[in-house]
Amino acid sequence: MAISVFDLFSIGIGPSSSHTVGPMRAARMFARRLRNEELLDSVASVRVELYGSLGATGHGHGTPKAVLLGLEGDSPRTVDVESADDRVETIKSSGRISLLGDHEIAFAYDDDMVLHRRKALPYHANGMTLWAYDAEGAEVLTKTYYSVGGGFVVDEDAVGADRIVLDDTVLKYPFRTGDELLRLARETGLSISALMLENERAWRDEDEIREGLLEIWRVMRACVDRGMTREGILPGGLKVRRRAANTARKLRSEGDPQALAMEWITLYAMAVNEENAAGGRVVTAPTNGAAGIIPAVLHYYMNFVPGADEDGVVRFLLAAGAIGMLFKENASISGAEVGCQGEVGSACSMAAGALAEVLGGSPEQVENAAEIGMEHNLGLTCDPVGGLVQIPCIERNGMAAVKAVTAARMAMRGDGSHKVSLDKVIKTMKETGADMSVKYKETARGGLAVNIIEC
């Protein structure tokens, strides 16, 4: 099994990779399967049921909207975010949906989109089942999918096999643990990012890798730029006001940016997460709920570190990807499975290690930075108020971005030797998530979600 950096960093839409990006992909997979098996023309209606965290917080995360767009053939990378809401309202009001854009059928939204708030499927907290029926009401096709975090989707056929979309690509330097990654670095004399580059060559040539990563950086930059200019109230009913644009104006008027670096980092992260909360174009990094941390630290590198350039951006994202794979392989990046430690904690760890890489850190210092970034997010709960990716998510990304820079700086002051390994902290995160009550796993049934009144 192999994971590419482009699996972890994918261009999509907000507000959630597990509740928006994944379900859209799953619904599109279902519709395409109908067409590929020559069943599409016989379909007269479809039904969708969302379970677990998808059912509990799906409305706040835009899951039904994502499913409808996916059934119509849209993908997270290319969907027109400006027209999406109007299209969904048309489906609801007309009672009709066009599968893959060319097969119109009946769809009674109130009856055919079912959210089970307290019922879960056994494999994963983010489960969804889709049915297709013919004109006589006979079942044409039924499929169950699981959105396992970061936009990754597996179907029921993969249950009991691998947790990741299967890929048997042979890598030059395969690794599954931090210890294996460090051993390869010592044996080859390569940096973490250089090892990752060699592995990415299994799918693409170096020019394609570079261009793909710089495209991800361009989308991250555009997201920050939009977030720092747009104002108003975020959707969803909490009446949360955007703050990034006003903060940006104040910081620009207050003098020396170097003296305000940490405030700029916080701003970059909040700008991304305000855009994400509004359903804008973002990059999963490795999830949408934590999408602001890596762009914020990467902006810090480009704007505040002397000598920063696009080569450094490529190395940053490659190193971050290597660390993210360790979390994906050995624990989880899903808030519905392990709490926010799996989302914000993983992103903080990835950003810390990547910053150490571009600051000239050794593989041991990179691993140390990543470990610090995760260690101090252990136990972090996922308790979104109103089921929306707004409170505490937006500010939390800003705090974690600053923490990532601090972790990298701490690691760079040492020689890479430390007591707690990255592997041990990943194992601890997984165990902590298993012990955590379901109330704190993206269900909006505990923590801030029940102590803050929605108004």
Curated annotation (Swiss-Prot):
Lineage: Bacteria, Bacillati, Actinomycetota, Actinomycetes, Kitasatosporales
GO molecular function (one): L-serine ammonia-lyase activity
UniProt family annotation: Belongs to the iron-sulfur dependent L-serine dehydratase family.
Cofactor(s) named in the record: [4Fe-4S] cluster
Enzyme Commission number: 4.3.1.17
SUPFAM superfamilies in UniProt: Serine metabolism enzymes domain
Pathway named in the protein's UniProt entry: Carbohydrate biosynthesis; gluconeogenesis
Cofactor note: Binds 1 [4Fe-4S] cluster.
GO biological-process terms attached to the record: gluconeogenesis
Keywords, alphabetical: 4Fe-4S, Gluconeogenesis, Iron, Iron-sulfur, Lyase, Metal-binding
Catalytic activity field: L-serine = pyruvate + NH4(+)
Entry-linked InterPro entries: ASB_dom_sf (IPR029009), Fe-S_L-Ser (IPR051318), Fe-S_L-Ser_mono (IPR004644), Ser_deHydtase-like_asu (IPR005130), Ser_deHydtase_bsu (IPR005131)
The protein's name: L-serine dehydratase
